[in-house]
Amino acid sequence: MSTISTTTAPEFIRVKRRRDEDSVQALLIDEGKRVKKQKFIFKLSKTVSSESYQSEQESSTPLLKLAHEDHRHFVLEQRKKSRRDSDDEKSQQRLAAEGSTVDDDGLPPEINQMVNDYLKLNKGVEKTERKKPSRKYFTGDSAKIASLPSLDYVFDIYHLEKIHDDEVARYNNEKNIGFVKIIEHIDLALDEESDPNEARSDDEDSNDENYYQNDYPEDEDDDRSILFGSEGEDIAALGEEIVIGVNKSRFSSWNDDKIQGSNGYHDVEEEYGDLFNRLGGKSDVLKSINSSNFIDLDGQEGEIEISDNEDDSDEGDDIEYPRNEFFPTDVDDPLAHHRDRIFHQLQKKINRS
């Protein structure tokens, strides 16, 4: 909301007061700043009651809100017409014009009068809508909104007129002068004709993979590049270098402890000489490992057959084997003999291996 100038002030205003109170002869427009010369003033035109309005213009005149108990400070709140209100007003004017020609179309005058009364009633209701009184346009005691008692009241009708320099002296008496502050409420609603999707082309598809708002990360496992952009990639690379460096330092320290000799030097030849000899002294480590791990499966099968034959021959022959007497009955017990024979065969296999 903003304070408007006198050029946009309404032509007529009205003030509600009790019948036994004195009226204010004129109202000066409070523009929030000192003005050397007042160019416009609201002069008291007449005083009427609510039942004796002579015209529709008087009944729809803006009503001032009392903002001080001395009945000399008022507030006029009016709403700026939006585009929709202007269109509605034009539509009503067009309908009214069409209604005025109904009689020419041959309709009865009673129906014509009913249509005109309906249009006037809707127009008057729309114009007489009022908002709640505001308390923030005056400071101090003036900020208190005074409510009138429910007694017999009248309306003072004021007319906006230009004031001349020679008429200023007539309104020097402060008791007969009041003040009105005109406040305009600006409708900040979004324009109906503006489309928020107007800037986007019809050829653009929001579901398209190449749409500018659809940004898919290349590496879903590493979210650092998404959060930090190119800096995140540099941080990730730096972290990998740090891990590699730590692993190298750990291996180096372990290697130094393992191969450092008593004389303080690295005895590499003594530590890994045996391993080098087993690999055949070859630079190709893989080939050396394969050649040193050659397994003769035929020879192993022959050894297994020989050992099995020896075991079978031992079981068939009456051989001597050491006896173990764990119990007094082991001397003549056949199970004890069989047990000692098995122990003897197992011991022979252990000795061969």
Curated annotation (Swiss-Prot):
InterPro entries: Iwr1, TF_Iwr1_dom
Family, as annotated: Belongs to the IWR1/SLC7A6OS family.
Primary location: cytoplasm
Keywords: Acetylation, Cytoplasm, Nucleus, Protein transport, Transport
Biased composition (Basic and acidic residues): 77-92
Note from the entry: Present with 1080 molecules/cell in log phase SD medium.
Subunit-structure text: Associates with RNA polymerase II. Part of a complex consisting of RPB1, RBP2, RPB3, RPB4, RPB5, RPB7, SPT5, DST1 and IWR1.
Traits of the deletion mutant: Leads to a K1 killer toxin hypersensitivity and pleiotropic effects on gene expression.
Keyword Nucleus among record annotations: yes
Residues covered by region (Disordered): 77-111, 192-226, 300-321
Protein name: RNA polymerase II nuclear localization protein IWR1
Name of the gene: IWR1
Composition bias type Acidic residues, residue spans: 192-208, 300-319
Residues bearing the modification N-acetylserine: 2
